[in-house]
Amino acid sequence: MMSVDKSLEIVSSAQEEGSVLSTLSETLPFAIGVAASAVAVIALVLILQGSRALSSGLSFTLGWVLGVGVVCAAGVAFGLAVSDDPARWTQWLRTLLGALLLVAAIRKWRQRVPSGQEPTPPKWMSGLQDSAPGKAAVLGFLLGGINPKNLMLTLGAAATLGASGLSSSEVWITGIAYVVVASVTVLVPMGIY
């Protein structure tokens, strides 16, 4: 039977700087933030109710995964390229991204529909049920990667990956894990369909 000291030693070694598990645990909140996108689930449900459900649904899902993946890869590549002092630039990037998210939240709050009025659905949602696979893929890419919230969260995760001290292969493997977790809310419904 393993002693408590041995268990604590294993846990602390997994949390050391440069550890894959430590980096995964640092990127997990970012991935959950991206995955918790109700807009993606709503769009996918609307697409799956259409006449081209399978092809457009797969295209949307692929577009989402590629959108998150491209942004993450670009951020990681940038982070690895400027890795002279990763701690300094990642702190500034995280501060900037946090401030941008705060500004976006305040802006969204001010633009909310007043109580008692019926909200109108966004224009991009009209016609989703009969969208072509190409349109669905582009929409998935834009919602997954270019959506301001997801863009900032994914760049935050990429900054964490770039400053992690892991080897290049470990960074890319951890990045793939991030993309999978960030895409789980579109992968699971599509897989069930």
Where in this protein do the model-derived segments appear?
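Membrane-interface helix termini and inter-helical loops of multi-pass transporters
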Residues: E16, F78-R88, T160-E170
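Structural signal for alpha-helical transmembrane segments and their membrane-water exit/capping regions
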Residues: Q111, I192-Y193
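Alpha-helical multi-pass membrane helix bundles of inner-membrane/thylakoid proteins
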Residues: S3-E16, A104-P148
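Juxtamembrane transmembrane-helix termini in multi-pass membrane transport proteins
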Residues: E9-D85
